[in-house]
């Protein structure tokens, strides 16, 4: 049962009961990346308390949008994952990500970020319709913590790659530099000057931003929430 109920006969009211609690949407974001242990969720959701996380997970299980799975050895761990009903919320959450871009602002020094969130960004902001036929490989972050993303454009738009064929462009960089290249707000020479490694065809690299549809408000029209402000 929901913690609260809107006395309104409306499917949006029911959706708000499922998603409206603080942290609920972000828990689903984490499970869109893949199944997660409780400890993984606690680490990735910086700022959530153990008790609140437990309550939110229990509520989402009650709604049938997530469940638990026991992984066999050698993992031998219990993980949370999206159910079919939870997976059906993916396009809704990606649309919310596009909506939230208006208030994102620049990356703050104290903001937590997981490199594999970028895969969700690629899904959320992929251009509709045909895009240049190019193959890209991104290594986001450094060392063993780097996240590898492979995707290509084409007649049907952006799609992720599972093959081992070489990419036209390979980028290795920290998240903020990769974001700058994806959006076209950072020139390749400026990214290299800040430590990015970029290999491959310069013409293909120039087509990278055209794989996406990023729309930015002017700073005067879209201000991010103050740090510590309640959503």
Task: Please describe what each predicted stretch is.
Residues 10-49:
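N-terminal helix-turn-helix DNA-binding core of bacterial DNA-binding proteins
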